[in-house]
Regions:
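Iron-sulfur cluster-binding cysteine motifs and their immediate structural context
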Residues: 17-39, 44, 55-72
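ABC-family P-loop ATPase nucleotide-binding domains
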Residues: 79-84, 89-90, 129-214, 228, ...
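The feature captures the beta-strand-to-loop junction immediately N-terminal to the Walker
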Residues: 104-109, 370-372
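H-loop/switch region of ABC-family ATPase nucleotide-binding domains
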Residues: 266-268
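Conserved beta-strand-loop-alpha-helix hinge in the C-terminal portion
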Residues: 282-319
């Protein structure tokens, strides 16, 4: 069978000639495989009539259509579908008591959707997206497996779940106050002091959440999950913003929690995953289109198959190439000319002082800045980039430096196109194709009033 995915943000029926419908072979034969309900509405693709020729994805000027062939047996195990011609999830992982069960896969495969289902926030619709999800149907569907009792317990309130979201940068938007105040509100277990000590949050308790670093927000989110004293702990990406020592510390605490609870973890750090997980469910598919959760494997076997790109038991190739690690790193054989140099400088930011020794950067080189959190790595890079000023810092010669910030701001008021134009301005024609700039992004002309970029 074939599934059709329509990216509603990319589809612009007012700006195209309906190439997907015009060139579709079944449509030319009188079969309404692709239909436009109205003059300005997006198309509806009937998957049961699709022959999988692949013409519409190639003809769509915006790349808004994906036609994917999948085995027929997968369609019998669909767990959740967001809507017509939208992402769908196949199969579910099996929970284990007193163990850490991990999900491993690329982005956009449905791992977060799976965690939302396991937490009870999302009730699976089994592909019937037009009807209201029914918890009784979920229990009946899994009545002969461990999942049946699992869903019965969380729906009846016999077992409490708590989900640590991956979007820790959104915490300042939904929570107000200091880190201590937020932790106190979640302190159902009465173990506030213990959690603060375990997560090394003692020096951050008085800090307002709006000024907290990414690492502090991550530990705040994890600490809040610990304090709610749930029976089932679901942690979606626990290591982002944390240095290696903090990652190891968090992993140890989660292993301790798993002795008394059911723990699910989504993690991309393979070293931490290998250490913390008792079993791993691999998730494969196509980003934004569909995801398939396979049966659990040992952590070492799952990681090796993920890196190789081939699932042996399932006989499925999830990637056309393997990910290999060379024993020896890349070594340059010739010396490159110096690009930029800086002197010894000191910068004071409140109670924090950074002292930097003189150094230089050569052309065609990749320089790593290694150290624990809150030691001034970001401040050092900001000084070099000219984002932060240090009175005695001399960086010369002054070259154009592109700075990608550690924290991504989503407070920009305007469209993606307007943000891009505000950033690159007159250079937009050398960066993007003429068709995109004049026909898609700015059909009515470039904006006259510029917003500030990120």
């Amino acid at each position: 069978m074939h599934i059709a995915i329509l990216d509603h943000e990319k589809c612009h029926p007012k700006k195209c000639h309906r190439e997907c419908q015009y060139y579709c072979p079944p449509v030319r034969s009188g079969i309404k495989t692709i239909d436009f309900p109205g003059p300005d509405t997006q198309p509806i693709i009937t998957e049961s009539l699709c022959i999988g020729c692949g013409i519409c994805p190639k003809r769509c000027p915006f790349g808004a259509i994906k036609i994917i062939g999948i085995p027929d047996e997968l369609n019998r195990d669909i767990i959740h579908q967001y809507g017509l011609n939208s992402f769908r999830l196949y199969s579910m992982p099996m929970p284990e008591k007193n163990a850490v069960t991990a999900l491993l896969g690329s982005n956009g495969m449905g791992k977060t959707t799976t965690m939302n289902i396991l937490s009870g926030l999302v009730v699976p619709n089994f592909g019937d997206y037009e009807s209201k999800p029914d918890k009784d149907k979920v229990i009946e569907r899994y009545s002969k497996s461990i999942l049946g009792q699992y869903f019965r317990d969380i729906y009846d309130g016999k077992r409490k779940t708590v989900l640590k979201s991956q979007f820790v940068d959104q915490i300042p938007r939904i929570a107000k106050g200091t880190i201590r105040e937020i932790l106190e509100k979640a302190n159902i277990s009465g173990k506030l002091d213990e959690v603060v000590q375990d997560l090394n949050l003692a020096n951050s308790l008085s800090k307002d959440v709006k000024s907290a670093s990414g690492g502090e927000l991550q530990k705040l989110a994890i600490g809040t999950a610990f304090l709610k004293d749930a029976d089932i702990l679901l942690i979606d990406e626990m290591t982002s913003y944390l240095d290696i020592s903090e990652r190891l510390n968090i992993a140890i605490k989660i292993q301790e929690m798993a002795k008394k609870k059911t723990v699910f973890v989504v993690e991309h750090d393979l070293a931490i995953l290998d250490w913390i997980a008792d079993s791993v469910h691999l998730v494969y598919g196509q980003s934004g289109a569909y995801g398939v959760t396979v049966k659990q494997k040992s952590s070492s076997k799952a990681i090796n198959e993920f890196l190789s790109g081939y699932l042996q038991e399932e006989n499925v190739r999830i990637r056309p190439y393997s990910i290999d690690f060379d024993e020896k790193g890349f070594v340059r054989t010739q010396v490159s000319p110096e690009l930029v140099r800086w002197n010894n400088f000191t910068i004071n930011l409140g109670d924090f002082t950074l002292e930097a020794k003189e150094g230089s950067i050569e052309t065609s080189s990749v320089i790593g800045v290694l150290g624990a959190n809150a030691l001034g790595k970001t401040t050092f890079v900001k000084v070099l980039a000219g984002v932060t000023e240090a009175k005695d810092a001399i960086v010369e010669p002054r070259v154009r430096i592109a700075y990608k910030p550690q924290y991504i701001s989503t407070e920009y008021e305007g469209s993606v196109s307007e943000l891009i134009y505000a950033t690159v301005k007159e250079s937009i024609h050398s960066v993007f194709h003429f068709h995109w700039t004049h026909c898609i992004a700015f059909p009515a002309g470039f904006p006259t009033k510029h917003h500030h970029g990120i």
